[in-house]
Swiss-Prot record:
Disulfide bonds: none annotated. This is Large ribosomal subunit protein uL23. Belongs to the universal ribosomal protein uL23 family. It comes from the Archaea. It comes from Sulfurisphaera tokodaii (strain DSM 16993 / JCM 10545 / NBRC 100140 / 7). GO terms for molecular function: rRNA binding; structural constituent of ribosome. One of its GO terms (cellular component) is ribonucleoprotein complex. GO terms for biological process: translation. The lineage of its organism: Archaea, Thermoproteota, Thermoprotei, Sulfolobales, Sulfolobaceae. Part of the 50S ribosomal subunit. Contacts protein L29. The keyword Transcription does not apply. PANTHER family: 60S RIBOSOMAL PROTEIN L23A (PTHR11620).
Length: 82
């Protein structure tokens, strides 16, 4: 399993609304291509880009920006984030 959880922090919700970006905690071994493929398959959307970082806790966090024709807030509603 690549995706562990979707973040629901204040910053993550702001990114969903303002930049069409989902914030996800992923498996440490997952590559950007793996994350992109998983999100596209899971929600039937197109991903514009993926930025990743390792948090201080040692978790891998991914910022997944969707293409303009898709809406991150729709996905957030389906997941119960918004």
């Amino acid at each position: 399993m690549i995706i562990k959880e979707f973040l629901t922090t204040e910053k993550a919700i702001k990114l969903i609304e303002s930049q069409n970006t989902l914030t996800v905690i992923v498996n440490k071994e997952a590559t950007k291509a793996d994350i992109k493929r998983e999100i596209e398959k899971m929600f039937n959307v197109k991903v514009d880009k993926v930025n990743t970082l390792i948090t201080i806790r040692g978790e891998k966090k991914a910022y997944v920006k969707l293409k303009k024709e898709f809406n991150a807030s729709d996905i957030a509603h389906r997941l119960g984030i918004l």
